[in-house]
Structures are given as structure tokens and as C-alpha cells.
């Protein structure tokens, strides 16, 4: 039979579920939104760690196994546990653990007075009332029976000194502090307003400068477009005039066609390219003229003629 082990496991699982319910209900009362799965996971991780690291789970399950073995007629483990609990070494070890816990509490700021008071008294809240009930524990009862409780009359007979508070002077002090704070806030606010106005003025001035520059850019763009259109018209007129003049010349058709092809290759849309094309055409004409002059010069020499520039 493992009924005791199953009961202990059930108690541990129920404790975990109670911890989850306590955590979620506390969050709901505080008005904090939460994810149930996340709370469940975090509480389970912490609960399992504490139960395993402290050895509480293994201790409870071990005692449950011992009880089940005793119920099944196996008393060896129970006898060993009884002997272990009554051994002087075990008692010394328990005293050592208790002393360690006391020193740990002292290091955390929980002194002896607080430990004794917490062990002797507990407070029970009354629902719906601001008052509460102070309950004495069994330790307090034992101390009373042993005569370890005394009444200090000095706390009862001592008269409470009532300090007279000058609320008017306090109010005046608070009013002065409030006025001083109000003045500082007002000065800071006025300074901030002045800075904001200055920033706005600078912004408006910058906007005006940008607007003027944009207008100038638009005027320059318009002028450039007009200049480009005029140049395109001039180049187109130039090409037409040269073509008309070329047709009136007594040159051969091949020469005319060659010059017309060069004229038609001029880019009339982009003035920069048009200037480059005209420069190339003029260079070609000068080169043709130079070749013609050299041919004429050679013919004159062959005919024994001389030439001179006038």
C-alpha cells in the first residue's frame, strides 16, 4: 500500500494549486493584468525549486514511505527513524540548524525581540472593522505558567506628553514654500515661453529665407528654360539657314549630302551637345578647306606656277 505517499503527493500538489490561486487572486485585487500561463509557470518553477532545494518534499515523501512500510508490516525503517530521532548526534544537529536559522534571521534585521513577540502573539483581523484581535500562542501560555511574564507599570503610569502644534505657522510656512515654488515655476515657464517665441521667430525667418531662395531658384529655372528655348530656336534657324545656303552653292551632290548629314546630326534639343556638334562640323570644313588648298598648291607646282598671298 502506498496510500500515505499518495496523500502526501496530493497535499503537495494542492499546496501548489493554492499558491497559484493566491498569486492570481492577489494580482486581480491589485488590478494588475496578468497571463495565467505565465503566472502558473513562474509559480511552478519557484515552488519546485524551493521544495526540492530545501529538502522538504523528499523529507515528507520519505516519512510517508516509512509509514507505508510500517503499515505493511515492515518496521525496520520506522525503528531506524525512531533511533535516529532519539540519537544525541541528531539532537545536536537539530540544535545547530536552529542556531543557524536564528543567526540568519538576525543578519536580516529580525532581532530576538521580534522573534519572541512573533512566536508569542498573532494578530487576527476582524472583517469590516479597523480593530483587530491579539491572540496568544501556546508559547505565551507556557511563559505565563512558568512566571516568565512581567508587567512594566512604567509604561502605564507614564504620562503622555502632548506637543502643541502651531498649525497657523505651519500653514504660513507651507504657503511661503508654495508661493516660492509657484514663483520659480512661473519664472521657468516665462523663460521657456520666451525661448519658444524666439525659436518660432527663427523658424519663421528661416522659412522666409527658404521661400525667397525657392522663388529665386524658380526664377533662375524659368530663365534657364527660356534661354534654352532661345538657343534651340537659334540653332534650328542656323541649321535651316546653312541648309538653304548650301543648296544655292554649285557643289557636287555628294558634298552637299555629306554636309547635310552633318547638319542633321546636330542635337537641337540639348544646346551643349549642339555646340559640340557645330564645333565638329566647323573642324571638318576647315580640314576639307585645308586639303583643297594643299591639292591646289600641288597642281600649281606641277604646272610650274607660283602663288602669292595678297
From Swiss-Prot:
CC annotations in GO: host cell cytoplasm
Family matches, as InterPro entries: NSP3_N_rotavirus, NSP3_sf, Rotavirus_NSP3
Coiled coil listed as a keyword: yes
Transmembrane region(s): none
SUPFAM superfamilies membership: NSP3 homodimer, Rotavirus nonstructural proteins
Region (Interaction with host ZC3H7B): 167-231
Region entry Interaction with host EIF4G1, spans: 205-310
Pfam families associated with the record: Rota_NSP3
GO biological process: regulation of translation
Coiled-coil parts of chain: 163-234
Region entry RNA-binding, spans: 1-146
UniProt subcellular location: Host cytoplasm
Region of interest (Dimerization), residue spans: 147-203
Gene Ontology molecular function terms on file: RNA binding
Keywords: Coiled coil, Host cytoplasm, Host-virus interaction, RNA-binding, Translation regulation
Similarity annotation: Belongs to the rotavirus NSP3 family.
Quaternary structure, from the entry: Homodimer. Interacts (via the coiled-coil region) with host ZC3H7B (via LD motif). Interacts with host EIF4G1.
Function description: Plays an important role in stimulating the translation of viral mRNAs. These mRNAs are capped but not polyadenylated, instead terminating in a conserved sequence 'GACC' at the 3' that is recognized by NSP3, which competes with host PABPC1 for EIF4G1 binding. The interaction between NSP3 and host EIF4G1 stabilizes the EIF4E-EIF4G1 interaction, thereby facilitating the initiation of capped mRNA translation.
The protein, known as: Non-structural protein 3
Amino acid at each position: 500500500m502506498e496510500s500515505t505517499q499518495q496523500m502526501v503527493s496530493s497535499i503537495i500538489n494542492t499546496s501548489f494549486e493554492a499558491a497559484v490561486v493566491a498569486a492570481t487572486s492577489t494580482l486581480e485585487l491589485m488590478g494588475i493584468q496578468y497571463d495565467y500561463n505565465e503566472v502558473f509557470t513562474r509559480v511552478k518553477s519557484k515552488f519546485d525549486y524551493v521544495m526540492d532545494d530545501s529538502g522538504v518534499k523528499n523529507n515528507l515523501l520519505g516519512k510517508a514511505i516509512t509509514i507505508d512500510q510500517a503499515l505493511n508490516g515492515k518496521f525496520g525503517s520506522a525503528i531506524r527513524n525512531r533511533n535516529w530521532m532519539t540519537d544525541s548526534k541528531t539532537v545536536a544537529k537539530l540544535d545547530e540548524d536552529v542556531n543557524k536559522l536564528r543567526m540568519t534571521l538576525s543578519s536580516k534585521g529580525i532581532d530576538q525581540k521580534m522573534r519572541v513577540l512573533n512566536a508569542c502573539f498573532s494578530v487576527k483581523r476582524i472583517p469590516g472593522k479597523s480593530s483587530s484581535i491579539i491572540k496568544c500562542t501556546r508559547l505565551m501560555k507556557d511563559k505565563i505558567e512558568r512566571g516568565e511574564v512581567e508587567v512594566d507599570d512604567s509604561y502605564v503610569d507614564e504620562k503622555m506628553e502632548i506637543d502643541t502644534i502651531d498649525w497657523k505657522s505651519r500653514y504660513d510656512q507651507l504657503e511661503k514654500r508654495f508661493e516660492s515654488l509657484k514663483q520659480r515655476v512661473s519664472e521657468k515657464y516665462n523663460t521657456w515661453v520666451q525661448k519658444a517665441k524666439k525659436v518660432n521667430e527663427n523658424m519663421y525667418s528661416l522659412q522666409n529665407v527658404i521661400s525667397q531662395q525657392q522663388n529665386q531658384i524658380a526664377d533662375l529655372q524659368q530663365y534657364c528654360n527660356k534661354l534654352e528655348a532661345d538657343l534651340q530656336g537659334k540653332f534650328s534657324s542656323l541649321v535651316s539657314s546653312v541648309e538653304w545656303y548650301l543648296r544655292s552653292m554649285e557643289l557636287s551632290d555628294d558634298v552637299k549630302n555629306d554636309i547635310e548629314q552633318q547638319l542633321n546630326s546636330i542635337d537641337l534639343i540639348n544646346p551643349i551637345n549642339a555646340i559640340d556638334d557645330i564645333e565638329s562640323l566647323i573642324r571638318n570644313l576647315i580640314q576639307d578647306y585645308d586639303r583643297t588648298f594643299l591639292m591646289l598648291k600641288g597642281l600649281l607646282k606641277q604646272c610650274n606656277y607660283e602663288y602669292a598671298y595678297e
